[in-house]
Amino acid sequence: MDSNTVSSFQDILMRMSKMQLGSSSGDLNGMITQFESLKLYRDSLGEAVMRMGDLHSLQIRNGKWREQLSQKFEEIRWLIEEVRHRLKITENSFEQITFMQALQLLLEVEQEIRTFSFQLI
């Protein structure tokens, strides 16, 4: 995984965790959980692409990987909509910056996952 993407994920998760401390919002906790899940999925997909010989074992081991891929894209779209909504309603500049960076990261990761998936098909 690109080191910038790793640090971006870590930065966004840290910022959201700080925001969570000041909020009782369950939605924010759900977003943090989905960001962490997305990071792990993106990492594993990237590793599979780097080990192209692992492609067949990936397909054999998990015959439903295309279905999972589709589910991840739906999760990304949900996260994008949720982040956009949060961005519209917040007036706190720290939160605005965090959500703008989260939105940019989601769009980048969506593109990376698309690229990886095309290489795996």
Curated annotation (Swiss-Prot):
Location(s), subcellular: Virion; Host nucleus
Keywords: Host nucleus, Host-virus interaction, Transport, Virion
Pfam families to which the protein is assigned, alphabetical: Flu_NS2 (PF00601)
Leftover remarks: Average number present in a viral particle is estimated to be 130-200 molecules.
Function: Mediates the nuclear export of encapsidated genomic RNAs (ribonucleoproteins, RNPs). Acts as an adapter between viral RNPs complexes and the nuclear export machinery of the cell. Possesses no intrinsic RNA-binding activity, but includes a C-terminal M1-binding domain. This domain is believed to allow recognition of RNPs bound to the protein M1.
InterPro entries according to UniProt: Flu_NS2
Species assigned in the record: Influenza A virus (strain A/Silky Chicken/Hong Kong/SF189/2001 H5N1 genotype A)
The keyword Glycoprotein is assigned to this record: no
Full protein name: Nuclear export protein
Entry's Gene Ontology BP terms: exit of virus from host cell nucleus through nuclear pore
Principal subcellular localization: virion
